[in-house]
A protein has these predicted regions:
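Short, small-residue-enriched loops and turns at beta-alpha junctions
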Residues: 51-54, 80-82, 107, 201-207, ...
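Alpha-helix-loop-beta-strand connector modules within alpha/beta enzyme cores
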Residues: 84-105, 138, 206-231, 263-274
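Glycine/Thr-rich beta-alpha phosphate-binding loop at enzyme active sites
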Residues: 167-213, 254, 259-260
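Short, acidic/polar
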Residues: 54-63, 178-187, 232-236
Length: 276
């Protein structure tokens, strides 16, 4: 008889939820991310740059992140001068949080991670980062059996030249060009991406504009990650209010890891009394 059955009527909104459950297999990282959005108004990721930490300091940071209410750890950076496998392994042993690779190149892969943001730099026109690195990485990812999360990666002007913009040879989308950003995000959704990542860049002076986040979120059916330039919990809360589904912090946590609880509260619940 099948799932629906003969002659049985199901309301359209219920059918949509059934289809979503079928399309995202249980126990995958994507299923976990969806569950975060069922519990909180948004999710919180901490980005760990392996070049800024030792194996032991990464493990301590992972433990603190979990205790502070962080939802997942992103692992990656613009460079990679250290072996990623021991770092990913130390994080897996120190925390139950998902370890999601955020690769700057095909060299930044590890079988010790749970998943990978399968990034395509859709805001740029450099074919190497639109499809070249993805083709090189695909066989390795399959061999490592990593969960893949297709992600449209968009660089947004953040007030300074960032490492990712320089290394990729890609100009960011200007902050005031909302329609250009909107069109890129919509194109990514139509191409089958599961996430949009709006990136002002590590160490950015300015975060992604809230107006841009709202305009993009209003027309998308997929989740939006926002990172770069988010230096205080109040800025994080502002971006969530604008429509961000997930917030990423990196550089600010490297300088003061005690801020993670304040960020977590602001992102999950809108609590900002610990802002600084």
């Amino acid at each position: 008889m099948g799932l629906i059955g003969i002659g049985r009527k199901i309301e359209p909104e219920i059918l949509v939820e059934i289809v979503k459950e079928i399309m995202v297999k249980p126990n995958t990282t994507q299923h976990y991310l969806q569950s975060i959005l069922m519990k909180h108004r948004a999710g919180y990721f901490v980005l760990i740059d392996p070049d800024q930490h030792t194996v032991s300091s990464c493990a301590r940071l992972g433990e603190l992140a979990e205790a502070s209410g962080v939802d997942a750890l992103l692992l990656g950076g613009s460079f990679l001068t250290t072996d990623l496998d021991p770092i990913a392994d130390s994080l897996k042993k120190a925390t139950s949080l998902p370890i999601i690779l955020f690769p700057g190149s095909v060299l930044q892969l590890s079988r010790n991670a749970d998943a990978i943001l399968y990034l395509s730099l859709i805001s740029g026109r450099n074919p190497h980062y639109l499809i070249g690195e993805q083709v090189r990485a695909a066989p390795l990812i399959r061999h490592m059996e990593l969960d893949t999360i297709p992600t449209g990666y968009m660089l947004i002007e953040g007030g300074t030249t960032t490492s990712v913009s320089f290394m990729s040879g890609s100009a960011p989308i200007p902050r005031d060009k909302l329609d250009i950003a909107w069109a890129h995000a919509l194109a990514a959704q139509y191409m089958g991406m599961d996430l949009i990542y709006l990136e002002a860049g590590s160490g950015a002076k300015l975060a992604v504009p809230s107006e841009m986040i709202s305009k993009i979120k209003d027309i998308l059916e997929i989740s939006v990650i926002v990172g770069g330039g988010i230096r205080t919990p109040s800025i994080a809360a502002e971006k969530v209010n604008a429509g961000a589904d997930f917030i990423v912090t990196g550089s600010i946590i490297e300088s003061d890891s005690s801020l993670m609880r304040a960020f977590s509260d602001a992102i999950h619940w809108g609590i900002e009394e610990n802002d600084s």
